[in-house]
Amino acid sequence: MSQCTVEYNVSEITEYVLSTLGERCQSAGIVIPTVIIYGTIFLLGLFGNICTCIVIAANKSMHNPTNYYLFSLAVSDIIALILGLPMEFYQSLDYSYPYRFSEGICKARAFLIEFTSYASIMIICCFSFERWLAICHPLRSKIFSTLWRANVLIILAWTISFVCALPIAFIVQINKLPLPEDAKYQPWTNKVSTDGIFVLHTEFCAMNQSRPDQQKMIIIFAFTVFFVIPAIAIVIMYAHIAVQLESSEIDLKGDKMVKKRRNKSNRTVLKMLLSVVITFFICWLPFHIQRLLSVYTTWSETTTISPPVQFLSMIVFYISGFCYYSNSAANPILYNILSQKYRSAFCRTILGDHIANFVFKGHQRPGQSKRCSSSTEAEQRTLMTRGSVRVDKPHRKLEVHNY
């Protein structure tokens, strides 16, 4: 009998396991696209974020607060990709249950993914605040926006994220599917269970299924504190920045050319950072929707879930997975698309001056400077700036929060 086949000596138990946990193995129609998409995300994300760290570290002209935040964000993305995607690959190719690994691995993976997701949003809040301060309160910015303060905020962000993610390590465990009440005292019970409590071969890594209230509390806390509140704060800050830049265009005093250049530089940087923020929230919204769906469709008076809700949960599962990991690969692409100065530093650092100039030589229009040619120190000084966990088994009818 294939390992993918769910079959017990008692047909009622077979139906119960299938209706609750779903099939053990995913179909080829799901596995192949999933592996291709995740493989592409993994390679692009890992390469792009490692290059981002190298570019920022290797160019002293990029050692400024905003780039320190972007470096930290790249580190968070690298951790998420390395810890998350290999397990996604494995679970796509292997059977979904029983869980093969130890409870320590189960807890560690869940904690680290939650930890890095919290760190990402806190870093995004930090560089949004830094830009808001620099444009709307420039005098205060000169005191606040220093490398030392940026390092302190980054350490603080990671520390807070670590502490807030700790509950995950305590509530996540290897669960087993409990026997139905009417099956606990049957003559055939010992054929499907060794302890008379749980069904054989149904282990899965997830939050403790006997503590639904705590599961809800953690997911709602993460959604509120690390998604809704940051989103509101960031919208307010960028709205204030937009108003400030618009008013500065109208009321240009002193050296108009200097102020125009400064505003243009600010707008370029803001365009890139705002793209990072928007991408983050677009990619993470399905993730949080899926987590909320998982707890509010699972923990009701009955475990029966209507077919439309099952279908919606499955669709949101796939969308949330692809979006969640796509966000980790998107930032380096945005930097290259939206920042010519980053492209220049990227090409010079990764490819070298001679190779970069040769590669891009044929792509220059008359009078246009080479995109990867060496920039002056003054140009580089302004480079790029002036101055949580899904349910693992999509096909289950009972959507539990898995890792």
UniProtKB/Swiss-Prot annotation:
Entry keyword annotation includes Magnesium: no
Example of a GO MF term: neuropeptide receptor activity
InterPro entries membership: GPCR_Rhodpsn, GPCR_Rhodpsn_7TM
GO cellular component: plasma membrane
Residues on Cytoplasmic side: 49-68, 131-151, 238-268, 326-403
Transmembrane segments: 28-48, 69-89, 110-130, 152-172, 217-237, 269-289, 305-325
Membrane topology, record value: Multi-pass membrane protein
GO terms for biological process, alphabetical: neuropeptide signaling pathway
Alphabetically ordered keywords of this record: G-protein coupled receptor, Membrane, Receptor, Transducer, Transmembrane, Transmembrane helix
Highest rank taxon of the organism: Eukaryota
Parts of the chain on the Extracellular side: 1-27, 90-109, 173-216, 290-304
Keyword Magnesium attributed: no
Subcellular localization(s) per the UniProt record: Membrane
SUPFAM superfamilies hit by this protein: Family A G protein-coupled receptor-like
Family note: Belongs to the G-protein coupled receptor 1 family.
UniProt function note: Putative G protein-coupled receptor for pyrokinin-like neuropeptide derived from the processing of the neuropeptide precursor capa-1.
Name the UniProt record assigns to this protein: Neuromedin U receptor homolog nmur-2
Lineage start: Eukaryota, Metazoa, Ecdysozoa, Nematoda, Chromadorea
